[in-house]
């Protein structure tokens, strides 16, 4: 009881916990607000090293931020111009292709064992509605919720502009909402969270770009269909560690089944090689920062996915890093002292 009272009397812990609970409640009630804040934080953390690099070159605070934002908007517009048209062109035929794969049960050409066939049939029967429902959900998300999606994009872009210019003032505000006696502790906590989440987001973005581009290059080089949609799918799913790799490979595997045994083996080998390279890059760039247990990662993805929906799955690991720092800064010292 004495230890519990001691925890409650720790002002830094108490106010941090209070603000976390309030934030989660607001995000649950207003999912669009959650989406805007997630995207703003994501892009701000991506642009941060660009701004710091320009500032080191003595370009000045405002020029560095304007240049970083212009670079961001150019890359975004160019990427959308290059990606969206071919993805929309391929989407309908890709759905038809997936439907034919499941209807024809093409995996029967590869599975000769009568004992294994029922197992694969059950797996594929489970995957078919899940994959179809997800693809239809993504398509309807953009078409039927066009106003909501547009609102999120507009507020994200405006918010990003202000956040990039006033990041120090925003950081100071978060420190000022703590009692004066614990502001130094709060400042150190937010600095550690910013460093851990920033490094993670930049590394996972680099990995996603490497894997997405690799799929596009290989599919284009061998003149394979659906290069745009497969590479975009690989890029997006790789923002979800561990689970995303499985999600990434499901449509790739189904597509490779139509290429024969040699095609299946070559694409599987390519996937293994590119993920091995991405894993090495991830390990090297994440050295010295918070490490997360794979079980903790999976549980975080599941929990925050249930709590906040699709966006929750993508922010599961950054939030897990947040709580890892929270544990190290506030809870562990209190428990160790008792």
Swiss-Prot record:
Gene Ontology annotations of biological process type: transmembrane transport
Subcellular location: Cell membrane
Entries under InterPro entries matching the protein: AI-2E-like (IPR002549)
Listed Pfam families: AI-2E_transport
Recorded superkingdom: Bacteria
Coarse class of the protein's main subcellular location: membrane
Keyword field: Cell membrane, Membrane, Transmembrane, Transmembrane helix, Transport
GO CC annotations on file: plasma membrane
Membrane topology listed for this record: Multi-pass membrane protein
UniProt-recorded name of the protein: Putative transport protein TM_1349
Organism: Thermotoga maritima (strain ATCC 43589 / DSM 3109 / JCM 10099 / NBRC 100826 / MSB8)
């Amino acid at each position: 009881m004495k230890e519990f009272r001691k925890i409650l009397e720790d002002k830094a812990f108490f106010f941090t916990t209070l603000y976390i609970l309030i934030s989660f409640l607001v995000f649950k009630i207003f999912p669009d607000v959650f989406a805007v804040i997630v995207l703003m934080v994501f892009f701000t953390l991506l642009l941060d090293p660009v701004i710091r690099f320009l500032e080191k070159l003595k370009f000045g605070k405002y020029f560095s931020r304007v240049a970083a934002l212009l670079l961001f908007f150019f890359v975004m517009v160019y990427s959308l111009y290059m990606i969206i048209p071919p993805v929309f062109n391929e989407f309908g035929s890709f759905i038809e292709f997936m439907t034919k794969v499941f209807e024809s049960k093409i995996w029967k050409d590869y599975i000769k064992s009568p004992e294994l066939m029922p197992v694969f049939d059950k797996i594929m029967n489970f995957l078919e509605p899940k994959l179809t429902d997800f693809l239809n959900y993504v398509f309807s998300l953009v078409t039927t919720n066009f106003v909501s999606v547009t609102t999120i994009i507009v507020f994200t872009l405006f918010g990003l502009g202000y956040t990039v210019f006033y990041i120090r003032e925003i950081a100071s505000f978060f420190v000022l909402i703590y009692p004066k006696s614990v502001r130094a502790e709060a400042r150190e906590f937010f600095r550690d969270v910013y460093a851990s989440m920033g490094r993670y987001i930049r590394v996972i973005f680099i990995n996603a770009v490497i894997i997405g581009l690799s799929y596009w290059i290989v599919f284009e080089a061998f003149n394979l269909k659906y290069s745009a949609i497969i590479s975009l799918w690989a890029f997006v799913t790789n923002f979800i560690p561990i689970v995303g790799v499985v999600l990434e490979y499901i449509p790739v595997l189904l597509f490779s089944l139509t290429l024969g045994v040699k095609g299946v083996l070559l694409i599987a080998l390519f996937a293994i090689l590119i993920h091995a390279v991405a894993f090495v890059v991830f390990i090297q760039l994440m050295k010295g920062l918070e490490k997360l247990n794979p079980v903790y990662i999976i549980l975080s993805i599941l929990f925050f996915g249930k709590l906040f929906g699709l966006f929750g799955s993508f922010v599961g690991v950054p939030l897990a890093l947040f709580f890892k720092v929270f544990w190290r800064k506030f809870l562990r010292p209190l428990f160790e002292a008792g």
